[in-house]
């Protein structure tokens, strides 16, 4: 388990004396590709990075800095080329040291609340947000140029990075921290108007759900997750053998329909927002010779006549 150590400090491992090498070895032993969750745009006011470079964080002049998680989190100023080099170096060092890394979840758990750059001159402060994202883009371009086969997920407390600007550099984005399957039907329905299924990370999560505390049958959670880019957000050690068998079958089935779901055309058949008690959509292959049909019951009505 990678500990929740200070963002901006050296990565630390708790209860893993073999370090990341040991985690990668364990993953390889079980035939699993290894991925890691990082948050390179963030720092903490109590971290080594902040102590060395307090001028690297976003901060409005003559204002007290607004802090995020834990009362210490801050956002690094990506308009600053030195910060760009530092953030690229985080990924580059990881990939150079551990070339077996196949996947990176790039998180950002604080919005830009301090609207000021300590790097930009006063006459460019109004462009801070634009310059931040231009710097972010430069970092992404460097990562993609050097590691074209690395799978990257854009994650920002959920869907904060769901935009066309990051899609050239990331393979998928995290739709929402809310993985409640019933609510995901609504969220993914709306998201599908703007983004294809291949971009929507859609994961099977535990029950009770960690956000809504709702208990939803595993089969229902699987069926909803399979309508996007399928993943698992659940601890195998907490699953029964029956549940593991069901998930193994779901993953195998998804691999057969994946080309249609991720590269096909979408047909919206019944919107969950119509409040008919059901939602339904269908993907078809470009040649229209294959189709995948989804149908979910969303509400219970007396004497309900289903389409």
Question: Could you say what each language-model-derived stretch is?
Answer:
Residues 76-106:
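An active-site-proximal structural segment forming one wall of the substrate-binding cleft
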Residues 34-38, 104-106, 153-154, 232:
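Hydrophobic faces of well-ordered beta-strands that scaffold small-molecule active sites
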Residues 27, 87, 107, 152, ...:
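Conserved, mostly hydrophobic/aromatic
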Residues 1-8, 12-13:
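Single conserved hydrophobic/aromatic residue that forms the stacking wall/gate
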Residues 272-307:
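Carbohydrate-binding surface patches
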Residues 49-85, 130-238:
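Glycan-recognition surfaces
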Residues 39-43, 108-111, 155-159:
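Active-site beta-loop-alpha junctions enriched in small/polar residues
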Residues 219-271:
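Catalytic cores of secreted or luminal carbohydrate-active enzymes
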């Amino acid at each position: 388990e990678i500990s929740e150590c200070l963002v901006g400090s050296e990565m630390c491992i708790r209860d893993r004396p073999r370090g990341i090498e040991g985690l990668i070895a364990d993953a390889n032993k079980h035939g699993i590709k290894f991925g890691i969750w990082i948050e390179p745009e963030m720092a903490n006011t109590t971290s080594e990075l902040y102590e060395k470079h307090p001028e690297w964080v976003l901060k409005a002049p003559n204002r007290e800095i607004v802090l995020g998680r834990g009362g210490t989190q801050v956002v690094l100023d990506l308009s600053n080329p030195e910060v760009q080099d530092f953030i690229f170096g985080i990924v580059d060092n990881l990939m150079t040291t551990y070339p077996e890394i196949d996947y990176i979840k790039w998180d950002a758990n604080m919005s830009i609340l301090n609207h000021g750059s300590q790097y930009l001159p006063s006459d460019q402060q109004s462009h801070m947000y634009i310059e931040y994202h231009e710097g972010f883009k430069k970092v992404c371009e460097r990562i993609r140029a050097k590691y074209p086969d690395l799978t990257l997920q854009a994650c920002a407390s959920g869907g904060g990075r769901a935009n066309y600007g990051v899609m050239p550099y990331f393979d998928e984005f995290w739709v929402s921290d809310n993985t409640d399957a019933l609510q995901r039907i609504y969220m993914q329905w709306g998201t599908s108007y703007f983004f294809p299924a291949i971009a929507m990370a859609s994961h099977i999560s535990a029950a009770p759900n960690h956000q809504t505390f709702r208990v939803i049958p595993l089969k229902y959670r699987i069926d909803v997750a399979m309508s996007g880019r399928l993943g698992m957000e659940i601890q195998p050690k907490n699953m029964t053998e029956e549940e593991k068998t069901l998930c193994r079958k779901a993953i195998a089935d998804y691999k057969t329909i994946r080309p249609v779901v991720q590269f096909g055309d979408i047909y919206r058949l019944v919107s969950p927002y119509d409040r008919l008690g059901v939602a339904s959509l269908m993907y078809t292959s470009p040649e229209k010779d294959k189709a995948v049909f989804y149908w979910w019951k969303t509400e219970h009505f007396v004497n309900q006549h289903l389409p």
